């Protein structure tokens, strides 16, 4: 587990925000003081990014394919700057995620917002992932028979 | 690795594609008809010391593939340029594809291109005080049937001689985009400049 630096904390909440739907973000904001006053510095705008991979995590890098990404950068009236990069073309999601990123850096509102929105969204996303993993695990094939035959 | 966060307070183009295309077209027209004043950057509010036309030219032309060198006077705008253009910065003027300045730098220190690839020469984006008054120059060269006129305040007194030396190396040499307020004019390396008043 990496040390809990401000950098890592922000990386975590940005990842959680990027996976949350626009409606979830809007509901979270509405429950914690509403949408702040902000100005869009850039976007929201959609584009393509090349996703790269390495075979086995250590091989030569190759281009896996392109994916659509929407990004947005906002600046709140208090001067906090929030960034968001989200998968797909949902401009509203990117804008709300950027606004939340800016608010989460706010020394006054940040902590309450983190406890009320990020922790809950992270738990929901983890539950969703483990549900998918559980369903996938049920279909896993164990090749006991073949291994035993070879050994014989 | 922790980098200093960029200090950006102002947005770029409201309509990035449309406005960048319009500004690109304005630069093309200005290059094709040296000395002609064209409008660029209306509605854009770049940070000091950039004028709207200068900011628009940067947003339209500069990106991560084109290293930019900043005159020390332009450093306050560095973060805005880095954020909105995604620009890489050159440490030496000679390495730069684009040079942004408020005072005419030594043109011999900028990249003039190579004979195999003269198009790799640097483009100097120079912000001047005015393009409607100041010293008057008569221009001749491709794109001008007889001659063109350019007024500029903020160029050095011996600009015509400096430009003559830049012109002498043709097809190598630096291209110049002059910006002031919301207007710009261009001097491609093919033009000759003669001071009138």
Where are these regions (language model features)?
Chain B
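N-terminal, charge-rich interaction modules
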Residues: 1-67, 71-73, 83-85, 182-183, ...
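Internal, well-folded beta-alpha domain core
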Residues: 65-66, 75-197
